[in-house]
Amino acid sequence: MRRLTLLLMLGLLGCGKAMPVDVFRSTTPAMDPIRFFTGHVRSWGVLEDRSGEPTSIVTTDCLGESDGDTLRMVQQLTIGRDAPTTRTWQMQRVGPNRYEATANDMVGTATGEASGRAFRWTWTLALSPGNDLKNVSMDQWWYLLDDGSMLNRTTVRKLGVILIEVTEHFAHVSS
């Protein structure tokens, strides 16, 4: 029943207006992004173009250190056969279930909110020099699963138009 409820809620994400994260408030386990990304975490996923066609495999390798309400994480991101890029995150809890973050390829500050097993945040990604799009909007939903792993769904937009969607599975790596 829990899976059916989660799948129905995920399905609502595809509908026009953004779903509020507090829809998930009564779900468990509770998502704490600082706790989740502390340690060694890897992801595997797929990047889809605007028509929903898979175009690339996405992998990340994340190493995070936390100190209470603060996380510093180095993320190696590989898309398809491209060379890996490094994103360095600084995340901070700024209130009950509220978070902010910066990263070396981010414009401004990411803002996010956790509720139950879900976390949603939005931020602006600065693309590499020479890319005509310059910046794109990132809308990320993270769902903590019963086994302690996480599902990520990211929608990348420019001027409100969906360019890319990414689905990833994140899991802790044993030492």
Residue spans for each PLM region:
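N-terminal helix-cap/turn-to-beta initiation motif at the start of protein domains
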Residues: 24-40
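Central antiparallel beta-sheet cores of small beta-barrel/beta-sandwich binding domains
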Residues: 44, 48-129
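Sec-dependent signal peptide recognition
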Residues: 2-7
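C-terminal motif of bacterial Sec signal peptides marking the signal peptidase cleavage site
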Residues: 11-14
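Amphipathic hydrophobic-ligand
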Residues: 54-60, 133-138, 162-164
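Bacterial signal peptide processing site
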Residues: 16-18
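A short, Trp-centered hydrophobic/proline-enriched beta-strand micro-motif
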Residues: 37-45, 152
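Glycine-rich, aromatic-bearing surface loops/beta-hairpins
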Residues: 144-175
